[in-house]
Amino acid sequence: MSIIELLKVIFLGIVEGITEWLPISSTGHMILVEEFIQLNASAAFKEMFFVVVQLGAIMAVVLLYFNKLNPFALSKTKREKRETMRIWYKVVVGIIPAGVMGLLFDDWLNEHLYNYWTVAAMLIVYGVLFIIIENRNKHRYAKINSFSELSYSTAFLIGLFQVLSLIPGTSRSGATIIGAIILGTSRYIAAEYSFFMSIPIMFGASAVKLLKFGFNFTSIEIITLVTGMVVAFVVSIIAIRLLMAYIKNNDFKAFGWYRIFLGVVVIGYFLITNGKVLS
């Protein structure tokens, strides 16, 4: 592997680590970055890489929340272990809608919606939604401030919002956070629940892509995958910590404005470059 290719992989890992957890669409950013940074690999490998690199990001959540999510921790009382198991039950309930829809329509969505128009439109639409919802909630208090207050029905409804994230440019975390806030969840719990729901969803998506691609990797492909995942892991730890510290005293409007700005830039760029936005 050349130094240039290694730097490309490192950069892609950084983008994944930042955008996976901020409500700004990791898939949308990866599509856009690929316009400027092309890996020297087959189309099948690149499609698989952009999904499997998320495993590094997911392991950051597992590490940061290991104690909170571990129902077998010796330091926990029986009551705390039961509470931890309830978190997992609510995660399972929440991922059912997106899991089912993803299995049924993943190929169709990739074929028909994996384009710059869709990405730009979803960036702008959800940017506007973030601003509207945060303005509406400015003087409201959250009804759900802990996982014990999160009901199974609310968890399922948040899962329905996550289905929207199957559309490129939406943002899985963005869709679930918006849904959770609309349903009365605090920003902090909304973000954490979004993180926890991502664990089985992204492990499952990565497993599907790996099975489709096969496990017959070249040495260069192995280095590419491992490097991307390690970088995404390290950057994700930093991004998650910064995001959780930020939302303790701030709302998500800044991310809404960023999404609108980026969506407009995307439309402008691809209109200027020979109408590629129509491809």
UniProtKB/Swiss-Prot annotation:
Gene Ontology terms describing biological process: cell wall organization; peptidoglycan biosynthetic process; regulation of cell shape; response to antibiotic
Keywords: Antibiotic resistance, Cell membrane, Cell shape, Cell wall biogenesis/degradation, Hydrolase, Membrane, Peptidoglycan synthesis, Transmembrane, Transmembrane helix
The reaction(s) this protein catalyses: di-trans,octa-cis-undecaprenyl diphosphate + H2O = di-trans,octa-cis-undecaprenyl phosphate + phosphate + H(+)
First-tier enzyme category under EC: hydrolase
This enzyme's EC code(s): 3.6.1.27
Miscellaneous comment text of the record: Bacitracin is thought to be involved in the inhibition of peptidoglycan synthesis by sequestering undecaprenyl diphosphate, thereby reducing the pool of lipid carrier available.
Protein name from the UniProt record: Undecaprenyl-diphosphatase
Taxonomic classification: Bacteria, Bacillati, Bacillota, Clostridia, Peptostreptococcales
